[in-house]
Amino acid sequence: MQFLYHDKDLAVVIKPVGLDSESAVPAAIIAELGGECYTVHRLDLIVGGVMVYARTKQAAAALSRAVQEGTMVKEYVTLVHGMPEESGDWTDYLLKDAKKNKVFVVDRPRKGVKDARLTFTRLSDSDPALVRIRLYTGRSHQIRVQFASRKHPLVGDHKYGARDAHKEPMLYSCCLTFPWKGRELRFEHLPGWADAARLNRIAAMEAAYDRRNPEDLAALAAYMDSGDWRADYEADEQGRIPRCMKRGVLSQDGLYNLLQEVRK
């Protein structure tokens, strides 16, 4: 497990996907650093990214207070199907069905309903689109259900309507900011797939393929001849790549055949 920072009070780590944030991660921190470890916030099992843990009771109290008061800012990146607006500020009422472990957007407050707010900025002009999100409330499945309810399910999120080959939602805790001893600490880490420039290049090449005029096909051929596509389609450290944008024209398996077609 990767450490971004640690001292006698704090440990900031990159939680891997599939590791439980309330048991396995603290155990790994203790095994590496010794002492104690206290959980002050959590991530779902299927979500990776930046987390902070307290190593003393005093630090745990201070960090928990930051969470409760909203001074711990949590930001995420994700890939969503479709292309949402450039930015947004969404507030919804969410209701969780515990038996199904699924959350739904409802139209009015009632027993069991919680309000949920996030803001976001779209970082790429592609489909799927790269989006950066700030959470103002930490509701169960909040990001997943708020985007899915607007017909932009997360790539890989089959529970909330995605129909693609990815095995888990492409959602990552990319940044934590919080007050600490009179100053503000900020820790940021991006996964390999959160590359807006790469997504825009792939989207532009798909658009060129769709248009199929001589200039576009020449640009597409040059892109493939240059070898740039190899870097654009490399898998990240978790083996997940946004390999097929809208229709998967430029998947690795199809590049050779596509190049032959372009050269006709």
Model region roles, listed by residue range:
Residues 55, 135, 226:
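Small/polar loops that bind or transfer phosphate-bearing groups
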Residues 213-221:
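Short amphipathic alpha-helical coiled-coil/interface segments
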Residues 1-117, 121-126, 148, 170, ...:
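RNA pseudouridine synthases
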Residues 222-260, 264:
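Long, low-complexity or tandemly repetitive, helically biased scaffold regions used
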Residues 15, 29, 118, 126-180:
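Pseudouridine synthase
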Residues 164, 193-194:
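Short, surface-exposed linear segments at secondary-structure transitions and domain or protein termini
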Residues 195-208:
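Short terminal alpha-helical segments
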